[in-house]
Amino acid sequence: MNDIKIQKLIWDSTFFGFEIGKIEVNNIEDNKSFKNLIEKSSFQMIQIFSKNDLSKLLGLNPIDIKLTYSKKPSKFNNYNNIKSIDCDLDHTLYSLARQAGKFSRYNRDFKLKMKFELMYKIWMKKSLERDLADEVFVHQNGNTINGMVTVNKSFNYAKIGLIAVDENSQSKGVGSQLIHSVENWALVQNLENIFVCTQKENSVACQFYEKNKFNLSDTIYIYHLWKK
């Protein structure tokens, strides 16, 4: 058990107002010692990340099965409706950010849900300020924003953070245009791959990424273990 450590999640602990830790582990060989480690810790909640399904060992269902999709960027024509943006004048982007997090584990966990909307508002705000994103694209018809995507670069790849399309504009190609704009941006930045994460439960998002030639590259089981 000496190789299993609990890492304090500083931002999460500060934001939610109690101690939150994180464990990354793929196999638990000594379940008794693992439970001992949890019980003796000072954390009120521990997030457990694993490449394997630990449900039986933990006696707990995953709060999220996180899927990571990836693809190499391709060149597309530029779209007149796609704009770069750095402010949210009418709160449309904050609304879309909340929509992007509909299947988020922070929304699904009833003990965290009360701060879910604020969390995604902060995420959108810091993306517009370019603290959590290098670029924010919107799909706009006149003065109406129909969709948005945030993206940042890390090393030789781009990572999509938030993406959402207004309910009235779905199934009209808006999301694909946003993805294509990210691909064009990634090529300009000389980035080799694009990554995006979603939840297995969000089947519509999974189908959307697969339609846009993304391939599943990783699966992570996430558990929220609350101390009694």
Segments and roles (model prediction):
Residues 11, 47-50, 62-71, 195-198, ...:
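Conserved catalytic-core motifs of GNAT/GCN5-like acyltransferases
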Residues 15-27, 156-167:
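Conserved acetyl-CoA binding element of GNAT-fold acetyltransferases
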Residues 24-89, 223-224:
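Acyl-donor-binding surface of acyltransferase catalytic domains
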Residues 29-37, 162-165, 171-188, 207, ...:
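Conserved acetyl-CoA-binding loop-helix of GNAT-fold acetyltransferases
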Residues 34, 51-64, 172, 176, ...:
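Conserved active-site alpha-helix within GNAT-family acetyltransferase domains
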Residues 54, 113-140:
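Active-site rim helix/loop that mediates acceptor-substrate recognition in acyltransferases
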Residues 81-104:
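A short beta-loop-alpha structural element at the N-terminal edge
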Residues 133-149, 166:
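Conserved beta-hairpin
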